[in-house]
A protein has these predicted regions:
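Structural preference for solvent-exposed beta-strand-turn elements
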Residues: 1-195
């Protein structure tokens, strides 16, 4: 089992996260809470479909808003993914998916390469889902990508319901990262010989 434990404390958040990368096709889960119900639901979707067990404790300045909580959770989760990947020997590296959630459809592609990049193309009709600011989806994904050291492309092709659009995004990203981290050999998947 590949695992990573990360603690991060700032004046805005105090986060502990333990990540376990499960065997391919295993169902993961989130244990713990961020204090933002809808965000917890999205993280559980990410974990379930990606094959990750995530033990999480977050204390954030929710009296201000959810920005620091969501972004910093992305920083810590990205850091944990990078640590759990180790030297990346044998990982599949590339993965992509078209993922439906009812009427919403998301396209996602990832390269677990050590090169951080995010392309994000999604729009929402509402500003808020529960206590979750829809603008924070891109902030979370940027923090995740840059701290994991992955190239991440996300495009919402269509959808009417913001809950479905957002959930489709989180599930697609989780699924892609889980697939990219599957181990198929002992070689590093790069013509350069390193990632």
């Amino acid at each position: 089992m590949r695992t990573a434990e990360i603690s991060r404390k700032t004046n805005e958040t105090d986060i502990y996260l333990k990540l376990t990368v499960l065997k391919p096709y295993s169902k993961g889960k989130l244990t713990g809470s961020t204090g933002i119900g809808f965000f917890d639901h999205m993280l559980n979707s990410f974990a379930s479909h990606g094959g990750f067990e995530i033990d999480l404790s977050v204390k954030g300045d929710l009296d201000v808003d959810g920005h620091h909580t969501v972004e910093d959770t992305g920083i810590v989760l990205g850091t944990a993914l990078r640590k759990a990947a180790g030297n990346m020997a044998g990982i599949t590296r590339f993965a992509d998916i078209l993922l439906p959630m009812d009427e919403a459809l998301t396209m996602c592609a990832v390269d677990f390469s050590g090169r951080a990049f995010l392309a994000f193309d999604a729009s929402f009709k509402s500003d808020i889902i529960g206590q979750y600011d829809t603008q924070l989806t891109v902030e979370f994904m940027r923090a995740l990508a840059f701290n994991a050291g992955i190239t991440l492309h996300i495009k919402s092709l269509y959808g009417e319901n913001d809950h479905h659009i957002t959930e489709s995004i989180y599930k697609a990203v989780g699924k892609c990262i889980g697939k990219a981290l599957e181990i198929h050999s002992d070689e590093i998947m790069s013509a350069k010989g390193c990632l």
